[in-house]
From Swiss-Prot:
This is Ribosomal RNA small subunit methyltransferase C. Its EC number is 2.1.1.172. It catalyses: guanosine(1207) in 16S rRNA + S-adenosyl-L-methionine = N(2)-methylguanosine(1207) in 16S rRNA + S-adenosyl-L-homocysteine + H(+). PANTHER family: RIBOSOMAL RNA SMALL SUBUNIT METHYLTRANSFERASE C. It comes from Pseudomonas aeruginosa (strain LESB58).
Length: 332
């Protein structure tokens, strides 16, 4: 059981009425709280919840509607996303109770101050290195417009400016990260055909690929619903076509790909987690057509070349700078 869920269950007497659990982990919490429904924006956790508790959790960027008397937000990493989620939940709870639970190292003390916009926050419990806070919604706000919260910026590329639309919670929100900047300069001479932007975030790499290879079919994949929505907005802002899918890792990607291009993810909430990146290297060959290429950016200190060569083929370093390297390998 997730420690945050354990803290909630210590106070289960507070959750006897219809309850919405936002950002809930894929553990036994829904079994322990049969009156609760879930709202998830993580495709992997949603798939696990669907398998165990069919129909009891929804995958979306917007809060589900329902006759909730209270809601719990499991604190996400992003402050901007927390603001949006709290406002979304508060809008559904006039006169109701809004709870916030999170790890101390995840910033729950700081985040509890964000509850003050809706009433007087109270700390209810502290255990398992987590805290539980509560506020009664004195005045419910209007439901926030997610798209109005987007940050938009332009990238000057060789073939013209690219418009990027970034929603709260998306990696490197509102700016281009250094790894992607390096990879954008190394998109030349990719095989033609079906291209995948794996871990697409706001869709920067995918949009640049479609601009550079307009005849190619494009798929963008991310585990996060807000990233999926951001990528769709970025493609639309540039008049580009592409399929954007939500999936937990490379296993959810299409097969017979001409190329996989990636700035792979390495965070799961507040924790560093290289599992999705390592699984990409281990399974890329299964999703590439013969002669297909994996091209990715990674921190220089990560020992990826041996893993790439073990599972795919000879690994070349195409570029290096700012603490990052661009690796390339082809399926034989």
């Amino acid at each position: 059981m997730d420690p945050r869920s354990e803290v909630l269950l210590r106070q289960r007497h507070l959750f006897a009425t219809p309850l919405l659990l936002a950002g809930l982990p894929a553990d036994d919490l829904l079994a322990e709280l049969p009156q609760a429904q879930g709202w998830s924006w993580h495709a992997g956790e949603q798939a696990q919840l669907d398998a165990r508790f069919p129909g009891r959790s929804r995958f979306d960027t917007r809060a589900p509607t329902g006759a909730w008397t209270s809601a719990v937000l499991f604190l996400p990493k992003s402050r901007e996303l927390t603001d949006y989620l709290l406002a979304s939940l508060a809008a559904r709870l006039p006169g109701g109770e809004l709870f916030l639970v999170g790890e101390k190292r995840g910033g729950i003390e700081r985040a509890s101050k964000q509850l003050a916009a809706y009433g007087k926050p109270r700390k209810l419990d502290s255990a398992r290195h987590c805290q539980l806070w509560q506020v009664r919604i004195e005045q419910a706000p209007a439901e926030p417009d997610l798209h109005a919260l987007a940050q938009r910026y332009s990238l000057p590329l060789a073939d013209g400016e690219l418009q990027v639309v970034s929603l709260p919670g998306v990696f490197s929100h509102g700016r281009l990260d250094r790894g992607s900047a390096l990879l954008l300069g190394q998109l030349q001479a990719l095989p033609g055909g079906h291209l995948l932007d794996f871990g697409c975030g706001a869709g920067v790499l995918g949009a640049a690929l479609k601009r550079r290879y307009p005849a190619s079919r494009l798929t963008l994949l991310d585990v996060d619903a807000f990233a999926v929505e951001s990528s769709r907005l970025t493609l639309a802002a540039n008049g580009l076509d592409g399929e954007v899918i939500a999936a937990d890792g490379i296993d959810g990607a299409p097969r017979e790909l001409a190329a996989i291009v990636s700035n792979p993810p390495f965070h799961q909430g507040v924790h560093t987690d290289y599992q999705a990146s390592e699984r990409l290297l281990q399974r890329a060959a299964e999703h590439l057509a013969p002669g297909g290429e994996l091209r990715l950016v990674a921190n220089s200190f990560l020992k990826y070349p041996p893993l790439i060569e073990r599972h795919l083929g000879p690994c070349r370093t195409l570029a290096e700078g700012d603490g990052f390297r661009i690796y390339s390998a082809r399926r034989s």
